[in-house]
């Protein structure tokens, strides 16, 4: 079953601010989450309901809602500051 991918407004803004090459790669990874929301590289974040995947030096933090087949992208950013405030 294919999941629907949605972005929080903050995540959409963060994606638009990334360099074009990185943005293209991240979009491909996010599109793949619709088919498999828990790929082999995905890691659950401790103390939250979120998961994350790595894309070069960037991270995509997202939530999977299995009951409604939804992948909600929460944040996208560089690894040095993506986890602040989660």
What are these regions (language model features)?
Residues 1-5, 10-24, 40, 55, ...:
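Enriched for short, Lys/Arg-rich terminal
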Residues 29-54:
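A short, surface-exposed loop/turn module that caps and links secondary-structure elements
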């Amino acid at each position: 079953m294919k999941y629907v991918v949605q972005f929080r407004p903050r995540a959409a803004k963060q994606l638009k601010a990334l360099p074009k090459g990185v943005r293209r790669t991240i979009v491909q990874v996010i599109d793949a989450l619709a088919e498999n929301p828990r790929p082999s590289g995905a890691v659950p974040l401790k103390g939250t309901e979120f998961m994350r995947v790595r894309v070069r030096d960037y991270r995509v933090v997202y939530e999977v809602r299995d009951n409604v087949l939804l992948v909600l992208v929460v944040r996208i950013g560089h690894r040095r500051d993506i986890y602040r405030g989660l």
